Amino acid sequence: MSRRAVYTGSFDPITLGHLNVMQRAKLVADELIVGLGVNAHKTPLFSVDERAELVERAVRAAGMQHVSVRTFEGLAVRFVRDCGARLIVRGVRSVTDMEAEFTMILANRKLDPEIETVFFMAGDEFSHVSSSLIKQITPLASDEELARFVPKEIIPDLRAKLAG
């Protein structure tokens, strides 16, 4: 039997930390679905379709197999169920991240007690990386510097979005 997991997030933009979580999630799942959430409370840099394309490009470049990208609106736990999965994958960088995730786990358990959440702690090299940081440093950093934080394949897209 195949084990399917879903890694949800906004991925705006995808970072090397996100890719690291995906690679590690593949250790516990045969198939990984990256669920790009549409959050009405956030103003994204990239549209959901652009984010999907960037994630697909980064996953391909990383050579990951059995990883697909889908978009969703609404509750993540419902999306996970609709995907036929029972595992939600989450990456955490800090105690603050864990506190927010803990609240979400409790809500998800009430909504669907059959769905479990698996956490992957960020490696030291990714514990400071966030999409917000990327947006802040892109106008100032060289491509070589940015490649320490994001897949090099998406740097031109970042530059185009954040130009001027």
PLM region spans:
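Nucleotidyltransferase catalytic core that binds NTPs
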Residues: 1-164
